[in-house]
Swiss-Prot record:
Domain of life the protein comes from: Bacteria
Stated name of the protein: UPF0102 protein Cvib_0014
PANTHER family assigned: UPF0102 PROTEIN YRAN
Family label: Belongs to the UPF0102 family.
InterPro entries: Restrct_endonuc-II-like (IPR011335), tRNA_endonuc-like_dom_sf (IPR011856), UPF0102_YraN-like (IPR003509)
GO MF annotation list: nucleic acid binding
UniProt-listed Gene3D superfamilies: 3.40.1350.10
Length: 131
């Protein structure tokens, strides 16, 4: 993998995940929301529930499944960004959850990737700061 491929892999993973979620009936509200150093890859509605979605993409599972990379520290960062998004949004106080999409993708030509597997972990974790 050349030096640009990890970034490309992540970007393509987010594109693959957004399409996958839309096919499952999610409505994408925003992508790559940033609050200070914290980022949420995808914010989507699943019915009336706001879903804050972390996308983890790997080229193989040799270093573990992609979703295993969402550490407690990463969960805290996502939760902080989610709180900021909710404070700025007009959604009121909706039901919320944290989902993870894990993708194994293989490189194609032209900086594109093809998903070998896509797995959704709905309600994958809870806000670690809220006990």
């Amino acid at each position: 993998m050349n030096s640009n491929q990890p970034w490309l892999l992540g970007r393509e993973g987010e594109r693959i995940a957004a399409g996958f979620l839309e096919k499952k009936g999610y409505r994408i509200v925003q992508r790559n929301f940033r609050f200070h150093r914290n980022e949420i890859d995808i914010i989507a509605m699943d019915g009336e529930t706001v879903c804050f979605i972390e996308v983890k993409t790997r080229s193989s599972a040799t270093k573990g499944e992609p979703a295993e990379a969402v550490t407690p520290g990463k969960q805290r960062e996502i939760a902080r960004a989610a709180e900021a998004w909710l404070a700025f949004s007009s959604e009121g106080e909706p039901d919320c959850r944290f989902d993870v999409v894990g993708i194994i993708a293989e490189p194609l030509s032209g900086g594109r990737f093809r998903a070998r597997s896509v797995e959704l972990f709905a309600d994958a974790f809870h806000d670690p700061g809220r006990g």
